[in-house]
């Protein structure tokens, strides 16, 4: 686990250090935090077009989007992040698993099922890095998704939809994105 391929990054010091840190006077276990992150998402294709349209916030006013995310947050009693682009919709939950997140979305959306992809823990971070760096875009390396991601993070922070601790998760996605874009020359 210390060698994850190119670029060669030595991660051994991270495995030796304590996973418990103090943030704003509160002890926080980083392993517990990352294991408590979940995501449900859909990338548009011919089989899920109607579902993506149903759950997207593209085209909603800022007030309607904020209300939608707040309703999800209230239903879960947990922080939630939402991002919609022209070809995907994704929701990240904190302190809930992906099944709970999906259940809340289905109930709020008044539908019985939707073809969400589920991710939990570190896989959420990995997928967000892949999406934001443009590696999962129709045009490899495009910058638009990163811009949309930053805008969505800023909106969630500005309106208190994410705590400081949970919003810092997205700072790590942005940092990793910079490294990937530099390594691949995007």
Predicted feature locations:
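A glycine-rich (often HGG/GG-containing) alpha/beta subdomain
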Residues: 2, 9-20, 25, 29-137
């Amino acid at each position: 686990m210390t060698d994850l391929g190119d670029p060669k990054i030595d991660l051994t010091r991270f495995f030796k250090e304590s996973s418990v840190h103090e943030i704003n006077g509160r002890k926080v276990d980083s392993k517990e935090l990352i294991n408590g992150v979940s995501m449900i998402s859909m990338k548009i294709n011919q089989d899920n077009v109607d579902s993506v349209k149903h759950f997207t916030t593209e085209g909603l006013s800022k007030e309607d989007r904020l209300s939608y995310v707040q309703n999800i947050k209230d239903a879960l009693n947990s922080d939630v992040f939402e991002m919609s682009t022209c070809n995907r919709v994704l929701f990240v939950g904190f302190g809930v698993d992906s099944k709970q997140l999906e259940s809340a979305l289905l109930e709020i959306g008044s539908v019985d099922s939707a073809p969400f992809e589920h991710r939990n823990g570190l896989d959420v971070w990995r997928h967000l890095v892949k999406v934001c760096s443009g590696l999962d875009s129709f045009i490899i390396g495009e910058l638009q998704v990163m811009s949309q991601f930053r805008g969505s993070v800023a909106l969630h922070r500005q309106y208190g939809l994410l705590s400081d601790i949970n919003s810092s998760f997205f700072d790590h996605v942005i940092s990793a994105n910079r490294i990937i874009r530099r390594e691949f020359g995007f």
